[in-house]
Regions:
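Short amphipathic alpha-helix with an adjacent loop that forms part of the alpha/beta core around
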Residues: 196-206
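NAD(P)H dinucleotide-binding glycine-rich loop of Rossmann-like/cofactor-binding domains
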Residues: 45, 78, 84-149
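C-terminal capping/lid region of NAD(P)-dependent oxidoreductase domains
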Residues: 4, 289-298, 306-325
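NAD(P)H cofactor-binding loop motif with strongest signal on the N-terminal glycine-rich segment
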Residues: 148, 216, 239
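Short glycine-centered segments of the SAM/dcSAM-binding site in methyltransferase folds
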Residues: 84, 142, 166, 232-233, ...
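Mid-domain Rossmann-like dinucleotide-binding core that forms the NAD(H)/NADP(H) cofactor-binding site
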Residues: 118-193
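Glycine-rich beta-strand-centered segment in the early N-terminal region that forms part
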Residues: 21-38, 50-92
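Glycine-rich phosphate-binding loop and adjacent beta-alpha segment
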Residues: 171, 219-291, 324-325
């Protein structure tokens, strides 16, 4: 088969389309013939040499894909050759074939195109696990989403609205904010022109956000805590603004607030399987019912993954960038 390889870390040109051995599914795995993969910022970090695959994972980038089951490994039941699936991966999505543990497989939701389904697993699992399983967002609460026009952001808006929350977003410029509004965002904040703390407090009559989903890390840490409501929950899932910051813990104590930081890729298989099962139970019906949908910015050939990385790094996209095999 062919896959995108990274012989040496570097810029987008470091991604090389090359012939590699076919993966062989192990116990409890299936072999998926990839229809499409989605580009994530984690893939960019891996290409740059900053985010290596966990032990035992495929060396090729790609944390989510869609396709058809081509073969079953030993001990697999409940799935059949030919089933259309999408999958949460530890790596290997940028390839014509990938071996996937069955606990990380999902059926393609009703009404979703096979290729578009590649836009779902990583973002849905990230949002559901952080916003709902960890931060316990409830109906009537306010959710602040940083990077509202990103793949994560566009999914967080939809899921927040689906459960009855008020959703605030930050994004860069009126065009991206307009797309967020189309998805249901209630409070639109242009981070280039406005202070998100002031805007959130103004929109909530001084209460603040009950849950904040943050991709920036250190750069926003102190301001995020100021924007939190009493008993608020800050979920840090990215470090685009740096990994080291200072925080007055007294502010957390006063608000009885919580800060969590999680990643998905390196979690044990059992934890990933639990998240995937929760997503299938709670989110898949929302997608099948048309209340939540994948948001796809553009689709490129898998062999042109470098262009997909350029788009992500330029932050010109809204939603997901897909690579089709």
């Amino acid at each position: 088969m062919y896959a995108i390889t990274i012989p040496e870390p570097g810029g987008p040109e470091a991604l090389v389309w090359a012939e590699v051995p076919d993966p062989v599914p192990s116990e409890g795995e299936v072999l998926v013939e990839v229809a499409a993969a989605a580009v994530n910022r984690a893939d960019v970090l891996q290409r740059q040499g900053f985010y290596n695959p966990p032990p035992g994972a495929s060396p090729y980038p790609g944390l989510e894909c869609s396709g058809r089951i081509a073969a079953l490994g030993p001990g697999v039941s409940g799935w059949s050759v030919g089933d259309e699936v999408c999958a949460l991966l530890s790596g290997g999505g940028y390839a014509e074939k990938v071996a996937v543990p069955i606990g990380q497989l999902l059926p393609v939701p009703d009404g979703v195109d096979l290729a578009a389904a590649a836009a779902l697993p990583e973002v849905v699992c990230t949002v559901w696990s952080n916003v709902f399983m960890v931060s316990h967002l409830r109906p009537g609460e306010t959710l602040l989403v940083h990077g509202g026009a990103s793949g994560i952001g566009t999914m967080a808006i939809q899921l927040g609205k689906a459960i009855g929350a008020k959703v605030a977003v930050t994004a860069g410029g009126p065009d991206k904010l307009a797309r967020c509004a189309e998805l249901g965002a209630d409070i639109l904040i242009d981070y280039r022109e406005q202070d998100f703390v002031d805007e959130v407090l103004k929109a909530t009559d001084g209460v603040g956000a009950d849950v904040i989903l943050d991709i920036m890390g250190a750069k926003y840490l102190e301001r995020n805590v100021r924007a939190l409501a009493v008993n608020g929950r800050l979920a840090v899932i990215g470090l685009q603004g740096g990994a080291k910051g200072e925080l007055n813990l007294g502010a957390l104590l006063t608000k009885r607030a919580a800060v969590t930081a999680t990643s998905l890729r390196g979690r044990p298989a059992a934890e990933k399987a639990a998240i995937v099962a929760a997503v299938r139970e709670h989110v898949w019906p929302l997608i099948a019912g048309g209340r939540v949908r994948p948001v796809v910015d553009r689709t490129l050939p898998l062999s042109d993954a470098a262009e997909g990385h350029r788009v992500i790094e330029a932050s010109t996209h809204v939603g997901k960038v897909l690579l089709t095999a």
